[in-house]
């Protein structure tokens, strides 16, 4: 496959990205290890926040902006934590039952947050693993502020009219309808469904204004990404496009410190993966 070059819209690095053959999970930044999917989500959030071509680490601090993200991975979460009122949560039933860490653990099928609490909710490759996904979408709609947006990626085929249901969840126990499929969480997280276009209709019925974007932004080495946006309002407002002249951030002596922060955050992710795999 031909090399892919561009600028990372998360850390600002410019150059040739590696593993372009891995599609959604590849085209990785050599500086911060963001994938094409990470950059696609950051790109959409940047468009919603009117940040243009600025990489995430140059976005202004706004602690009045409250963001909820499930199973956050990649380099952007540590930057979001510095800039916004950011809830990066994991699904851990034992921790959720304790109720001691509401900013770190949550069940999207039964969120413990107040109504109209968040400006943005992000779930990247999460909802194919949520047992009762419609409950989750309704909960997110409830906790979004009016005009707030839900940004989601899932394995999605826009050509498919109907979602493929892999597991019957109508009873207390899962009943497999197809060969079990696992990925994420060290390869131990069950996939309940493979989404088709009826997902958009479901979100619309709940009340969202819905948009589906097939994203290809060569300037940021974003390739073949489907992003779904649900806004708690009358319409989805996107977007400004990519300026011809990209930002040229000055990394300077702060680069080692930034890389340390990214490493520190991702250690938390690795620990969670290990615990999840052990529990399974």
Where are the language model's segments positioned?
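Short beta-turn/strand-loop junction motif enriched in small, turn-promoting residues
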Residues: 13-16, 75, 216
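N-terminal juxtadomain amphipathic helix
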Residues: 1-63
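Membrane-proximal basic amphipathic "stem/tether" segments
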Residues: 1, 241-280
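Conserved SAM-binding loop
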Residues: 58-171, 197-203, 227-232
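A local structural micro-motif
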Residues: 16, 87, 210-211
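S-adenosyl-L-methionine-dependent methyltransferase catalytic module, highlighting the catalytic core
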Residues: 2-6, 131-145, 149-251, 270
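Generic detector of short, locally flexible boundary/turn motifs and exposed helical patches
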Residues: 31-33, 49-56, 68-69, 87-88, ...
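Aromatic-residue hotspot detector
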Residues: 17-20, 24, 118, 206-208, ...
């Amino acid at each position: 496959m031909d090399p892919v070059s561009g600028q990372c819209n998360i850390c600002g690095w410019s150059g040739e990205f590696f593993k372009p053959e891995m599609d959604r999970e590849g085209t990785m930044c050599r500086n911060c290890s963001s994938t094409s999917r990470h950059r696609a989500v950051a790109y959409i959030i940047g468009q919603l926040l009117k940040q243009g071509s600025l990489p995430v680490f140059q976005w202004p601090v706004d602690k009045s902006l409250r963001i909820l993200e499930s199973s956050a991975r990649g380099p952007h979460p540590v930057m979001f934590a510095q800039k916004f009122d950011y809830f990066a949560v994991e699904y851990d039933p034992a921790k959720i039952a304790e109720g001691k860490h509401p900013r770190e653990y949550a069940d999207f099928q039964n969120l413990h947050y107040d109504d109209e609490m968040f400006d943005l909710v992000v779930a990247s490759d999460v909802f194919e693993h949520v047992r009762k996904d419609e409950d989750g979408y309704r909960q997110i709609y409830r906790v979004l502020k009016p005009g707030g947006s839900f940004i989601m990626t899932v394995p999605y085929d826009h050509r498919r009219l109907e979602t493929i249901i892999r597991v019957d969840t109508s009873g207390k126990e899962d009943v497999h309808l197809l060969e079990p499929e696992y990925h994420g969480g060290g390869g131990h997280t069950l996939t309940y469904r493979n989404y088709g276009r009826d997902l958009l209709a479901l979100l619309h019925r709940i009340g969202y204004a819905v948009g589906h974007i097939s994203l290809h932004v060569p300037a940021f080495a974003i390739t073949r990404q489907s992003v779904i946006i649900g806004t708690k309002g009358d319409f989805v407002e996107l977007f400004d496009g990519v300026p011809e002249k990209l930002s040229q951030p000055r990394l300077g002596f702060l680069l080692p410190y930034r890389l340390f922060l990214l490493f520190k955050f991702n250690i938390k992710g690795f620990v969670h993966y290990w615990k999840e795999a052990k529990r399974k």
